Amino acid sequence: MDSTDKKVQVASRLPVPPKRKYVSNDENQEQMQRKRLRSSLESELPAVRVAASIATSKPRAAPVAALPKPQVIGRQSLAVMRPKNSGPGITSTSFSGKTKVSSSVTQPAAIGAEKKKRAAWDLKGQVNDMRDTVSNYKGKMQNLTGENARLLNSKEKLQREVEVLASENSKLSQERCTLESQLREVRQQVSTFEREVARLTELCQRQEKELSSHTNTIEELQGANAILTKQLLDKEVKLDCVSGENTSLKHTVNEQTDEIAALKVCLAEKDTEVHSLDTERRRLHNLVQELKGNIRVFCRVRPTLTPERELPAGHISFPSNDGKAIVLSKMEESHIGREKKDAVKYDFNFDCVFPPPCSQESVFEEISLLVQSALDGYPVCIFAYGQTGSGKTYTMEGPEDVTDDSMGMIPRAIHQIFSSAEELKAKGWQYTFTASFLEIYNETIRDLLINRPDKKLEYEIRKVNSANMLLYVTNLRYVKVSCVEEVHELLKIAKANRSVAKTAINDRSSRSHSVFQLKIEGENKQRDLKTSSMISLIDLAGSERLDRSLSTGDRLKETQCINTSLSTLGMVITSLCNKDSHIPYRNSKLTYLLQNSLGGNAKVLMFVNISPLEENFAESLNSLRFASKVNECVIGTARANRK
């Protein structure tokens, strides 16, 4: 410092805020570290109080140069820059302990401690003291500047080391990630391998079990194979024997084949012969029926019922043993007194007469040949005639509780038809059957196969077409049947629906004519033959005189319609016998419906049923007279309906 004493004007020590600029966070931290360093240095300066203004003639001293701002790297470098008060010398240790720097700074004696405080007027002394202090600070500043340079170099080295370490750290991080990824893959593979090992272990165990099982099976098969091998040897021996037999059998087969061919030729000839014989049988059967008459009359006397056992019934006798005659006898009184005359006898002869003990089966045996004619293609009509209560319904249908022995003519005829049709299948015949069941009540047709008939339906008799005389009834139910049981069910339905009523003569009198018809269609494809016929089985309503029946109201109308239709039936049969040009079929619904079953192509059988009671003598006599008249008729030769 210049020795010339000059008066220096000391500036105010109040802090002046600097013009601050916007700095980044890193720069801000660096400035903060510099401020801390500066404050630590200033704390070591002695506190000197200087007057605010000094009157001196000396020039002002130059302002103290500002300390250079060292670049602070981190806390470790900052710790180096902060010297500790450890005596007169200050020892600084370089960063990370690699470089050690020692510097001894001569520190002046504490101002104001060892020296006495100068007087306020001793400005020169004060200036000298200040100069000494500045000189000391300059030396310290130089030391700090050198230390700062060394620290900067160390910082650069450390930065380079940090960069190298950061690069190595990045590489190591990447390697660590790679190794972790590989570790995860290896762990997954290990888990997969463990599962595979478990699966293979389980599979191995199963294979071992199967191997054990197969081993046992092989042993069993080997044993069986040994047995079969032995059997095979035995079979080969037998085969040699059988081969010889086979050769001889082949010769036998050839001979039998020739014989079978010859038998087939013979069978064809026999079949032709059988057909010829069957045709001849049909012809002879029809001839027998014609010889017996195409209109045949059977008389049947019903047995006495339990309530009638005490009533007189000895007026009927059967004089001959041939079963064709019946005699009615009656004692007559004189007109002038009670004197009795000789008994009057009425003799009648019919095709067959059945006394009361005759069973249903014996009666059917006489009509079975007529039923067979229906399968041969002839129209057949069988009806029962007689007064009410004479046993017509019993003869045709059977009793209420029917059994195999008490079945009437209708179920027995159906059974025979189906049985014969089954037997004829062996001869190449196939049959189809269509059944219907109706009643004619007060000249009105009713369908007995419908439980609740519609009153709006009208049943009219019409021709199928104008080319033939086939008839049908509109709205009537025609049922295809294939077995006896189906027909029996239809008979039960019809029996429940038939009109019956109580009269003075019979508690359960049939008040209508019931007509069961079965259409039979047969075909023999081998012979190219077809047949079509109709069998009609009729239970006529009971004939009775109005004076005996005491009918009134509806019963009177029923009796009148019944007697009218029966009279028309007698007229039709008489006209057929007389071969009249006009046959009054249309006079009643019954004769109009049965015209194809009563004409020249038909075979007709009439049952006349009479009561065994003497009180019914007049009605029995009238019935026998009507039957005798029918028995005298000849309606011509019946013809089968064949194509």
Swiss-Prot record:
Pfam short name (any one): Kinesin
Annotated region (Globular), positions in chain: 1-116
Start and end residues of each stretch annotated as Disordered: 1-42, 81-101
GO process annotations (BP): microtubule-based movement
Domain Kinesin motor, chain residue ranges per copy: 294-633
Keyword Nucleotide-binding: yes
Binding-site positions, ATP: G386, Q387, T388, G389, S390, G391, K392, T393
Compositionally biased region (Polar residues): 88-101
Subcellular location: Cytoplasm, Cytoskeleton
Coiled-coil portions: 117-296
UniProt-listed InterPro entries: Kinesin-like_fam, Kinesin_motor_CS, Kinesin_motor_dom, Kinesin_motor_dom_sf, P-loop_NTPase
Notes concerning its domains: Composed of three structural domains; a small globular N-terminal, a central alpha-helical coiled coil and a large globular C-terminal which is responsible for the motor activity (it hydrolyzes ATP and binds microtubules).
Function field: Promotes mitotic spindle assembly.
Protein name (Swiss-Prot/TrEMBL): Carboxy-terminal kinesin 2
Species assigned in the record: Xenopus laevis
